[in-house]
Amino acid sequence: KSYTGGLIAPESDNNLWNYKFTWNPRNVVLAGQGGDAKYIEENKEISISYNDLFKNTESLLIDQYGEFEAYANRDSLKYRSIYKLNDIGTIYRGTIRRAGFCNAWNIFVQLGMTDDSYNIENSNNMSYREYVKYFFQSNSKNSVEANIKKKFNLDEKDIVWQKLLELDIFSDINKIPLTNATPAQILEHILVKNWKLEKNDKDMIVMYHKFGFKKNNVLHQIDSTMVSIGEDEKYTAMAKTVGLPLAIAALAILNQKIKSSGVILPVSK
């Protein structure tokens, strides 16, 4: 099992979602779309639809950094052949978030706010509140707040409700500056205003791997973790962990330590 997440470092974590954008916001909003998430666990193949993805999370505890959760990341099954692990009984790729994130994010999914397949006409004339109201029947006599509370069984003290309020999505004042935008594009706009890295913010990459194997007929497990903290909003952990391996490979090619050509994966010596 392999888990990875681009998160916000504890010292820069100052919102209820425990999250800020440390890479492409659009990819975060659309995460999980484009097909069922698939993996195999104890020789059983499992498939999870996008609609159910954020309801099916796994709890993780990372030493010194606390509680996290993970959801299945796209199709893990194809990596069996890539890594020559065709007979493996468990292979799972997961995306890490802080505990509680997915439960709140699931509201956006269920309402249809992450849909990028159609455009909302005259979206540039809408307020945030009108955007949220768009996903409920126009003849509803209840307020948009009441509709959401009823649909998702929330009350004023619920942390999920507090997370929604923090985003100011019920505002009549805040306007959407996007013309004929998709629901996902509008949601991205709202979230970027709330979750962008501020000056001197530090991001955090968390990687957690579980390796199970049998030796001398005895089952063993090895856990491997890596946590990388960025320097600031520019020199991020995301930039380092993505960019440095590529730079190392480029130098190895120039120094002829890597002699293969073309697009190659790091799966062989």
Predicted regions and their residues:
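C-terminal catalytic/substrate-binding lobe primarily of soluble NAD(P)-dependent oxidoreductases
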Residues: 2-269
